[in-house]
């Protein structure tokens, strides 16, 4: 294992709790869980029940049965192997409360997507700092954290659309049609929640095929073309809204997804086998401009296109 990386390791497992709505009465436990957690089908949930991993109202569930509605289900997930992660970073600012780091690509900020302890949140626990927002696992750059609830609340407010904080990223994308060097382009299309076979629902661009949309969020991005190569475009992207995967989605909406993005594809399609935590793209949180408070981070060593 090279320096600056934490080896893959087993955690101690985790207990997931779900309250069952009354409307689910009569549905088998395995079927309800399979619908809620699309990564596992009913047969796999039946295996977990047989293995003694599920509780019904705090008592062991000994067999698949019909739900009554209103009960609590607990899945005691056994320990699993968490992947290796980078665990070193550059500190950009630290005044004893506010902490801003240059997060390396590949480090998850919070639990999710197969990570529980191999996260920035867990690594920061001894310092008392906690993340204010969440960069994607494979997005590098400025990650704001704070040690007190007051400072976390202050910065969370600044990150809102009317908070006055400008977040400036750089990204490598497929060529953006009609955009020339130095030109800017405004993207104000909604980020929408649409079906996904593994996750149930996922945030993405508005589909061409009329697929159902569960929710919409307004989003605003400003693009500027900094460099054009045969392989793709290097863009500066400024956002005032912080929607889930906003930059990845807006570029896919334009038909110019991030180079190497395994999830958001051409023609506004979304991969049926990838998830938001999969890497391969290049997106860097470069600058934060909060008026009198401005910070900038250096790029990863492999940022350019070879």
Please report, for each region that a protein language model flagged, where it lies by residue:
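RNA pseudouridine synthases
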Residues: 1-306
């Amino acid at each position: 294992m090279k320096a600056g990386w934490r080896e893959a390791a087993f955690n101690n497992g985790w207990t997931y709790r779900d309250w069952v709505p009354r409307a689910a009465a009569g549905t088998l436990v395995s079927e309800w869980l399979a619908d809620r957690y699309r990564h596992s089908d009913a047969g796999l949930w039946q295996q977990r029940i047989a293995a003694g991993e599920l509780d019904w109202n705090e008592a062991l569930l000994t067999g698949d049965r019909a739900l009554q509605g209103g009960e609590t289900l607990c899945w005691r997930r056994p320990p699993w192997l968490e992947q290796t992660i980078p665990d070193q970073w550059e500190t950009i600012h630290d005044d004893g409360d506010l902490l801003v780091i240059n997060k390396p690509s590949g480090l998850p900020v919070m639990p999710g997507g197969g990570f529980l302890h191999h996260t920035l949140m867990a690594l920061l626990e001894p310092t008392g700092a906690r993340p204010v927002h969440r960069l994607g696992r494979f997005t590098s750059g400025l990650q704001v954290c704070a040690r007190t609830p007051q400072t976390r609340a202050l910065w969370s407010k600044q990150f809102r659309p009317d908070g006055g904080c400008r977040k400036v990223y750089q990204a490598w994308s497929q060529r953006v049609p009609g955009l020339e060097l130095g030109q800017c382009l405004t993207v104000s299309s909604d980020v929408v929640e649409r079906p996904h076979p593994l996750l149930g629902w996922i945030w993405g661009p508005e589909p061409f095929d009329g697929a159902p949309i569960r929710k919409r969020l307004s989003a605003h991005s400003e693009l500027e073309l900094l460099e054009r190569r045969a392989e793709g475009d290097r863009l500066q992207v400024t956002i005032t809204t912080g929607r889930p995967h906003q930059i990845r989605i807006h570029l896919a909406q334009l038909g110019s997804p991030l180079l190497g993005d395994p999830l958001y594809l051409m023609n506004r399609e979304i991969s049926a086998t990838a998830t938001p935590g999969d890497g391969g793209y290049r997106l860097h949180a470069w600058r934060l401009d909060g008026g009198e408070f401005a910070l900038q981070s250096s790029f990863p060593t492999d940022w350019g296109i070879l």
